[in-house]
Each structure stands twice: as C-alpha cells, then as structure tokens.
Amino acid sequence: NFRSSLEKIWQQRCALTGCMISAALRASHIKPWSIATDHERLDPNNGLLLVANADALFDRGLISFKEDGSLVAASYIDLASLGLPDAAKLNFSSATAEYMKFHYQNVFVGAN
C-alpha cells in the first residue's frame, strides 16, 4: 500500500527530521489527494513520510520543497520552534521532483 511503499523509500524515517517513531509518521501526499488522479493517489512518487507537525504544515502549503530538495517555509513560520530543521535538503527521484514542483507552485503559500 501507499504507506508501506513510502516506508521503504524513506527507510521508515521522516524525510525531514529522520524520526523513526512509526506512530508519529504520516504518509503525506505531495499533490493533494483531493485533486490527484486515482493513479497519483497511489503513486509512491507522490508521497513523503513526515512527522505529524511537518505533515500538517506541508498539507496546508506552509512548507514545501524546491525541485532540488531545498526546504522552504512561509515567512511567518518559525521552524525551530516546531522542532523542525530550518535548512534541510531532501534527495528524491525525478518523478517525485515533478510532484514537488506542482506542490511548490500550486500549494505552497509563499511561491510567488
């Protein structure tokens, strides 16, 4: 399933923090479920394994990642106060980069 695929890709760790507490991790869709096709909803390239607070920010477009994997946050978000790294860079596949480009351009509130 989707979560199991993400656990394999991200080695059962939060892509952002490295947290390995399974109960704290969420299988997060990059292109939101509500606008994704059936294929995109199940495509593991359209997902990140994130701790719950990072998932909440990502889902609401308050954080995102550029195509090169660099973390970006809305200007009013204090990542350190949330226990999140303020300078992170993820390594992901080119297929994931395409989904991330969509998220950065269409979901992230600070894209323009």
Where are these regions (language model features)?
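Internal active-site segments that recognize and position negatively charged phosphoryl groups
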Residues: 1-18
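A detector for short metal-coordination/catalytic motifs
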Residues: 9, 19-22, 30-112
